[in-house]
Amino acid sequence: MTQMAAARNGTVTEEMERVAEREGVDPAFVRQQVADGQAVIPANVGHDSLDPMIIGREFATKVNANIGNSEETSDIEGELEKLHTAVHYGADTVMDLSTGRNLDEIRSANVTHSPVPVGTVPIYEAVKRASDPSEITHELLLDVIEKQAKQGVDYMTIHAGVRMEHLPLTDGRKTGIVSRGGSILAKWIEENGMENPLYTKFEAICEIFREYDVTFSLGDGLRPGCLADAGDDAQFAELDTLGELTRTAWKHDVQVMVEGPGHVPMDQVAEQVERQQEVCDGAPFYVLGPLVTDVAPGYDHITSAIGATEAGRAGAAMLCYVTPKEHLGLPEKSDVRDGLAAYRIAAHAADVANGREGARDWDDALSEARYAFDWREQFDLALDPDRAREYHDQTLPGDNYKEARFCSMCGVEFCSMRIDQDARSDGDMESIEADADDRTPLEDSSAAAVNRPPVGTHDGADIPGPDADMPADTEGSADD
């Protein structure tokens, strides 16, 4: 029985109980949100290492990290190291977007070791097995999807909304079709002269998903790839189809979230979130950024985190991170770290802006430690403690500076907080308590787990590092 079926039957599952604990809400509320399709708990029945989490606009904003290999870099150990990094730095879910060798082995290793939900895009494996997009058959697609479901994948991006009738709508674009899945299916449609097989076989996919409790992540294959293409007829025609498919999946008791753009001018972000919520009857919105400018390759974790903050404030339930390597190359471990930092900031800022219960407690606790010159507490409370400590110690490395009432930015003479404290102690201004006993007690905070330190809610100790004994890369595997 799927989480949605159980919820509709009035049953609070173990997964719902765990989610309620992590979010600080009543399990009955979780059940109702899942029953109504307003939230999803991606939890394949075969993912034994999973710690359940929830995605929905009434819950803390979540962050996904994309990992995966390519033909140029196909290394199982490296992918597990990326998984370890993603989990350590706060990814709520990960997507394995591998397109190189050893797809089965990498996917299986990720599911085996990941405490967070694992997503995939099955059309990638279908292309690898067929050698060319036009050679993909309906049977091959269903076979790949069922195999990945059996492996324990929690959610899959299914680009079923790319219809034959939509393709002419992309003709006037500046950047055409920028989704890998969308472009693959567009080529299939053009060369075979038939409707998208993921659309025509959608109900069969629903049956597979219902058996293994896989969540749909309905892909936006026609998402805009630049500001000029945002909000065009192609994007919104596909969105209308995604609304139709959402309701079809719900009839099968299958959970659904809907993917969104992309590249969107800042002033259109909230409008696009609101339109998705209306068209898709409140199904959780999962957005890639969006990037709010196209001029900063190398810094697109920043251009997109700006849009992601606005999307989260407007109601997007999960933000798909973008790394500094976006548009330039395959991310490495350090890029995963930087992308997650940008997106954890975006998600937290959105939760604070939306008045999510307890979300600002973390900010208050760090501010109190800062005013008290409690450097060690500041580092411990930081979103990335290692980075905060590293930057401080570059100029003031000695332990004695951990007790100092200044840092190297202002020095002793010009530290504003030191001057303020001295003025309050010597004059008529009321003093501000800076003792540890008077600070915000985070252990009593009502905030969801993702809005309290440490950022990585799982330590990742069970995820093998690069030196672990893993299967060797194999030339000529079935996935080549």
From Swiss-Prot:
Pfam families: ThiC_Rad_SAM (PF01964)
Cofactor: [4Fe-4S] cluster
InterPro entries linked: ThiC, ThiC/Bza_core_dom, ThiC/BzaA/B
Start and end residues of each stretch annotated as Disordered: 426-480
EC number of the protein: 4.1.99.17
BP terms from Gene Ontology: thiamine biosynthetic process; thiamine diphosphate biosynthetic process
Molecular-function GO term, any one: carbon-carbon lyase activity
Co-factor binding details: Binds 1 [4Fe-4S] cluster per subunit. The cluster is coordinated with 3 cysteines and an exchangeable S-adenosyl-L-methionine.
Keywords: 4Fe-4S, Iron, Iron-sulfur, Lyase, Metal-binding, S-adenosyl-L-methionine, Thiamine biosynthesis, Zinc
Swiss-Prot/TrEMBL catalytic activity: 5-amino-1-(5-phospho-beta-D-ribosyl)imidazole + S-adenosyl-L-methionine = 4-amino-2-methyl-5-(phosphooxymethyl)pyrimidine + CO + 5'-deoxyadenosine + formate + L-methionine + 3 H(+)
Binding site for Zn(2+): 263, 327
Purpose of the protein: Catalyzes the synthesis of the hydroxymethylpyrimidine phosphate (HMP-P) moiety of thiamine from aminoimidazole ribotide (AIR) in a radical S-adenosyl-L-methionine (SAM)-dependent reaction.
NCBIfam families in alphabetical order: PRK09284.1 (NF006763), PRK13352.1 (NF009895), thiC (TIGR00190)
Protein name (record): Phosphomethylpyrimidine synthase
Protein species of origin: Haloarcula marismortui (strain ATCC 43049 / DSM 3752 / JCM 8966 / VKM B-1809)
